[in-house]
A protein has these predicted regions:
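Active-site flanking residues adjacent to catalytic metal/cofactor-binding acidic residues
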Residues: 36, 140, 212-214, 270
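Short aromatic-centered micro-motifs
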Residues: 295
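Metal-coordinating catalytic core of metallo-dependent amide/deamination hydrolases
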Residues: 3-18, 24, 32-148
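Active-site-adjacent C-terminal substructures of enzyme catalytic domains
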Residues: 137-138, 147-260, 275-277, 287-289, ...
Length: 307
């Protein structure tokens, strides 16, 4: 609860300044579209505060910000998982809808930390269904610490993306591949928590698109997608080409943004990263010192990290 208590005690201005500083750093690492989650308020007032901050960043920062509402990140003192899920479904989500309709906040996604002993499958399903009823699309944590069989449920809920996945099984992979859900591996978290690798090769071989993400949070404070791609190759067994697609087109698809972002095509946003190196592979190969020369956002130079 350390981070939750600090978020609850922080002013909106402090949170906004912190978020904008992190987005600035992400831009210099080549990120032009970022999912930003709530999830460290865990009561309605504090979650709304976080979502207001994310909305302000969406309107003011050069990075395209996609807000993910994460009301069920942990069970807070005074609640059981069941009572917290009930409160989220009956009280919090209707309030989120009202504020979204007013334009005060703009979450597009909904997330639950679906894990044994925290929010299990039925509680997660109820929260996702309530979120979907107000137009939020599921993009959630599953199968990180223990196998729970949540992959099939996520597929049934038409999740855009599912993340962590270290204990995802064959049945879950098949269901998610059939649903077109993107599997989001988080190699920095896997590395720092000494978790088994997500079964990305089996996912790819089964036709399930794989994305990579930083999972930037207090337990995995990494903002560098070039480093994430490096870890994806070394620790998860991706090829460099697979890692690049995972951090671009498939990542955009996990946010419902692949029609506009994620590849260089006529009609898409002009977001580019120019690398000063003999070949693009040096973006991944040069561990911790990616040779990013220019970051272009919507056809305009947004950052020049090496100048």
């Amino acid at each position: 609860m350390f981070t939750v208590n600090n978020v609850r005690a922080s002013s909106e201005e402090d949170l906004y300044a912190h978020l904008m500083a992190q987005l600035d750093r992400m831009l210099h690492f080549g990120t032009t579209v970022a999912e930003v989650k709530s999830g460290y308020g865990l009561d309605l007032e504090s979650e709304v505060k976080m979502l207001r901050v994310i909305r302000r960043a969406e309107l003011s920062h050069e990075i395209t910000v996609v807000a993910n509402y994460l009301p069920a990140h942990s069970v807070v003192p005074g609640h059981t998982a069941a009572s917290m899920a009930q409160d989220i479904v009956t009280r919090q989500i209707p309030a989120i809808k009202a504020l979204k309709d007013q334009g005060v906040i703009n979450p597009l996604l909904i997330d639950v930390f679906c894990e044994k002993g925290i929010f299990e499958v039925e509680e997660t399903r109820a929260i996702l269904e309530a979120g979907r009823s107000i137009g939020l699309r599921p993009n959630l944590h599953i199968e990180e610490l223990k196998h729970l069989g949540s992959g099939v449920m996520a597929a049934e809920q038409q999740a855009l993306g599912v993340s962590h996945l270290e204990h995802l099984d064959t049945e879950g992979i098949a269901a998610l591949a059939q649903a077109g859900t993107v599997g989001i591996a988080l190699p920095s978290t896997q590395y720092l928590l000494h978790l088994p690798p997500a079964p990305v090769r089996q996912m790819i071989d089964s036709g399930m698109p794989v994305a990579l993400a930083s999972d930037y949070n207090p337990n995995a404070p990494c903002l560098s997608l070039p480093l994430i791609m490096h870890l994806g190759c070394v620790n998860l067994g991706l090829t460099m080409a697979e890692a690049l697609v995972a951090c671009t087109l498939n990542a955009a698809a996990s946010l419902g943004k692949s029609e506009t972002y994620g590849s260089i095509e006529v009609g898409k946003a002009g977001d580019l990263v120019l690398v000063k190196a003999p070949s693009w592979e040096h973006l991944i190969y040069q561990m911790g010192d990616a040779p990013i020369d220019v970051v272009v956002k919507a056809g305009r130079v947004a950052a020049t990290p090496r100048h």
